[in-house]
Amino acid sequence: MDRAVSQVALENDEREAKNTWRLIFRIAILFLTVVTLAISVASLLYSMGASTPSDLVGIPTRISRAEEKITSTLGSNQDVVDRIYKQVALESPLALLNTETTIMNAITSLSYQINGAANNSGWGAPIHDPDYIGGIGKELIVDDASDVTSFYPSAFQEHLNFIPAPTTGSGCTRIPSFDMSATHYCYTHNVILSGCRDHSHSYQYLALGVLRTSATGRVFFSTLRSINLDDTQNRKSCSVSATPLGCDMLCSKATETEEEDYNSAVPTRMVHGRLGFDGQYHEKDLDVTTLFGDWVANYPGVGGGSFIDSRVWFSVYGGLKPNSPSDTVQEGKYVIYKRYNDTCPDEQDYQIRMAKSSYKPGRFGGKRIQQAILSIKVSTSLGEDPVLTVPPNTVTLMGAEGRILTVGTSHFLYQRGSSYFSPALLYPMTVSNKTATLHSPYTFNAFTRPGSIPCQASARCPNSCVTGVYTDPYPLIFYRNHTLRGVFGTMLDGEQARLNPASAVFDSTSRSRITRVSSSSIKAAYTTSTCFKVVKTNKTYCLSIAEISNTLFGEFRIVPLLVEILKDDGVREARSG
């Protein structure tokens, strides 16, 4: 029995010994595993250049720098994306739209002409060079941010003169009128053979042409058709407009002085004429006894007309028959426009009294001098469906020469400053159902005209006078919402005398550096301006057709002054040679 017990005890001791060594082995293996893992982690961290806790302080700064780099990269990429979007979504469709508009204008013109050919009135297809597609009759400079007067005219550029000049000392060329459509331009002026003061006989020069680009890239005006209306008729105060059928012209016919005409009892004879693309001219008398039944004198505004909604629109003015319905409806109506930062010191009641009297100047026998707008349907029949709009004198000043302009989708009426208000005026105009509505005007305080006292260039109070000179502004710079910001024009930079023609860009209060024709003593008169763009080069040009003193051959020579519109912040003046 003792042996059996000893055997059992021995087996137990052996089992315990095995368990002990097994435990020691397991502990050793676990220890080695932990050590190996620690060494591996340390090696890995070392190989990766891991930071110690003390190094972790700079991590937020590094993250911020990395974030800035990423943001900058994304920003530059966004600029590229924005440019791509602007090109693809905005500029390309606009360019296509401009091209489409020009093509549609040409097709419309052709359709009119083909219909005319069917009626034996001849037809042709003049059109500007492709370089000008989308650059005529458009908002040429769209800029919300730049100072308007940072744009300025270059020195006058040499180009082909498309305007005939007098050929004798007694010859006189006066009263230029110009209009340009997407397909062609029209120009006219009056020619008097025996001095500019002769009112009894004259002839009218009328021309149709297109814009071309020379092989060296220069702009020039190419006359395709022209005619001298040298007959027994005495056309005066003519306005011209480029329409799908050619050059439509509105003229009055008179053999008496303006003062005598205003003292007569019947309206002035008026004709609607057209120079077709075939070079033939036709005209038709308007029924002035019906159209101007309340008027004693009526004249076109001299400035160009505009083709809008299948009709041609002209500015007209003249004298109303006292106590006629048209005269009575204007009784007591007036408007006072004020100079920028230079208000009239007179008592308000006195200003109102003078403003009312300004519509009835003594020079024309106390007749009310009224502004109006005439629209005529454009068809192969001349003088078709004429409609006269007489705006209220709560908007317009005393009637005067003027011009209808269309730029983009906006229409304007320029009114010469013949009354007391010297700064240039552009009335926004809307058309509907053959009639026009004028709205409160844009005024350009630095774009003044000379005038006799008390209505000189610096005048600031209402007064009764007939003075000034025709110097129209052309809408040049717009906000993106199509609101007008600035204009180009050639003013006469004098206080009372018609001297010193100077071209500039104007905003509502100031002007850019100017380009002078010559010294301040040079005599000048009417100016009319039109701007356009050579789309191929993205260069904007402005043409000012100006009456400049020409003592050797006639009193005036009509000169087409061409400038390029430049941009910078300088204030120097440019002068033509």
Swiss-Prot record:
Important for interaction with fusion/F protein: annotated segments: 124-152
GO molecular function, a single term: exo-alpha-sialidase activity
Ranges facing Virion surface side: 48-577
Coiled coil feature spans: none
Species assigned in the record: Newcastle disease virus (strain Chicken/United States/B1/48)
Name of the protein this chain belongs to: Hemagglutinin-neuraminidase
UniProt-annotated location(s): Virion membrane; Host cell membrane
Catalytic activity: Hydrolysis of alpha-(2->3)-, alpha-(2->6)-, alpha-(2->8)- glycosidic linkages of terminal sialic acid residues in oligosaccharides, glycoproteins, glycolipids, colominic acid and synthetic substrates
Pfam families for the chain: HN (PF00423)
